[in-house]
Amino acid sequence: MTVEIRRPVALVILDGWGINPVCEHNAVCQADTPRLRALLESWPHARIGASGRDVGLPDGQMGNSEVGHLNIGAGRTVYQDLTRISLSIEEDTFFENTELRKVMQQVVESQGKLHLMGLLSDGGVHSHMEHLYALVEMARRAGVEQVCIHAFMDGRDTPPQSGAGYLAQLEDKLQDIGLGRVATVIGRYWAMDRDNRWERVEKAYRAMTEGVGTSFESSAAAIADAYAQGQTDEFVEPRFVGGEKPCTVDDGDGMIFFNFRADRAREITRTFTSSDFSGFSREKTPRLAGYVCLTEYDASFGLPMAFPPETYPELLGEVVSRAGRKQLRIAETEKYAHVTFFFNGGSEEPFDGEDRVLIPSPKEVATYDLKPEMSAPAVTDAMLERVASGRYDLIVLNFANPDMVGHTGVESAAIAAMETVDACVGRVVDAVLNAGGSLLITADHGNCEQMADAKGAPHTAHTSNPVPVILVDPDRTGVKLRNGILADLAPTLLELMGIDKPAAMTGRSLLEPS
């Protein structure tokens, strides 16, 4: 039987919506979500692997938004930068990297300092400590005499007060290698902003360049003082280590940013490298011997990168475009890069026939537990307007709330976030069905389905749980969905659209005829 091709086909991504059989401290379970529950009861659904090897990460590694959207858009399991870089260390090719060797040689020649900055974490979302250790060892081999480490504290992808342990591990490792010192300790809230909150970035920048902030004799003392003041890792106010002689960024120094994820690396990189920077007034602009990004943060930067991006032919967006179909990407600021840049394989450029809608995320609150609805109602309004236009064949929509509010660790707020998203999903489903379309509702990784750890403390990180997928299509009521992985979503969408799957897509459609 020939199935009618419905349009639009909507991919609705509930960011951070995972499956957890335990209801306690589970915002998904605790929330009153009548529309999502009805969808799960009435329409075909299955489970999707969104972590570890299923998305090209190491075994057991939790998924994240960048990895999730990259896998979804590629229609294949994508070998992630974390795995790629770690493998190069194992194989010793890391220590022959051209750009890393070059900046270290420049520092030796200028008799400057080498600054290594990034997220001190083994969370594997933005960085990994093993990469930092390899850089210090490489600097030792290269003859670099001074290595200064600017340690950005995590607390989102790791427990909120795990930073003290990570700093202790780092200090032990530096002792073993015989090179390097911690120069600054800064919460990621300040150093890794991605929403143009330049007042935050300025505090981190001034700590690194001018030594502005409280001085401590050791990294252990710095983090202990932060905890004593009620600051968890993410929010540790910039402080420098070394007493009278802070290890600041000066003329002739070199810098390596060891984060491999792009979105939260752009602003601080722009602050150090842009000649026409306007985010704030820089009191000091060091003339650097070199600046190397571990991966490509933004193609427009034109900066050296140790691991250039890999290309992925025949992405979902490209295949839809070549078929002459129109597509839309829509999200609020916090997830806009994910439905555009990451979904398109790390490319900023839209495909022909691809439109984009950006709804600003709230700026009037410091953390989203204070506004758990975020901009979801406005995103929904914009979505419904575009559905009504009848222009689009494929719409990719992201609701940020379950992830961004989940990261705060405030369970009541995460429950409110899920209830907001439930109402918004209901409006979207009604509009798409009324327009003659169909939907796949899913997530990129888990988060808010676990809001406390085993000890009952707030859980602010992603999870390695599977995520749901629901097919809402009145013409396919007899279809069953099989369990799969994120890479299977693109082939499924193409089948719903009546477009042949390209050879480069190794994912398989989730549709199983009954």
Curated annotation (Swiss-Prot):
Cofactor(s) recorded in Swiss-Prot or TrEMBL: Mn(2+)
Pathway the protein takes part in: Carbohydrate degradation; glycolysis; pyruvate from D-glyceraldehyde 3-phosphate: step 3/5
Active site: residue positions: 65 (phosphoserine intermediate)
Disulfide bridge map: none
A biological process term (GO) from this entry: glucose catabolic process
Free-text comment on the cofactor: Binds 2 manganese ions per subunit.
Example of a GO MF term: phosphoglycerate mutase activity
Superkingdom field: Bacteria
Gene3D superfamilies from the UniProt entry: Alkaline Phosphatase, subunit A (3.40.720.10), BPG-independent phosphoglycerate mutase, domain B (3.40.1450.10)
EC number(s) stated in the UniProt entry for this protein: 5.4.2.12
Catalysis: reaction(s): (2R)-2-phosphoglycerate = (2R)-3-phosphoglycerate
Keyword Manganese assigned: yes
InterPro entries from the UniProt entry: Alkaline_phosphatase_core_sf (IPR017850), BPG-indep_PGM_N (IPR011258), Metalloenzyme (IPR006124), PGAM_B_sf (IPR036646), Pgm_bpd_ind (IPR005995)
Binding-site residues, substrate: 126, 156-157, 188, 194, 261-264, 335
Keywords: Glycolysis, Isomerase, Manganese, Metal-binding
Class in the EC hierarchy, top level: isomerase
One Pfam family hit: Metalloenzyme
Entries under SUPFAM superfamilies matching the protein: 2,3-Bisphosphoglycerate-independent phosphoglycerate mutase, substrate-binding domain, Alkaline phosphatase-like
Residues bound to Mn(2+) 2: 15, 65, 444-445
Keyword Isomerase: yes
Annotated positions binding Mn(2+) 1: 403, 407, 462
Family recorded in the similarity comment: Belongs to the BPG-independent phosphoglycerate mutase family.
Quaternary structure note: Monomer.
Chain's role: Catalyzes the interconversion of 2-phosphoglycerate and 3-phosphoglycerate.
UniProt name for this protein: 2,3-bisphosphoglycerate-independent phosphoglycerate mutase
Organism per entry: Syntrophotalea carbinolica (strain DSM 2380 / NBRC 103641 / GraBd1)
Gene: gpmI
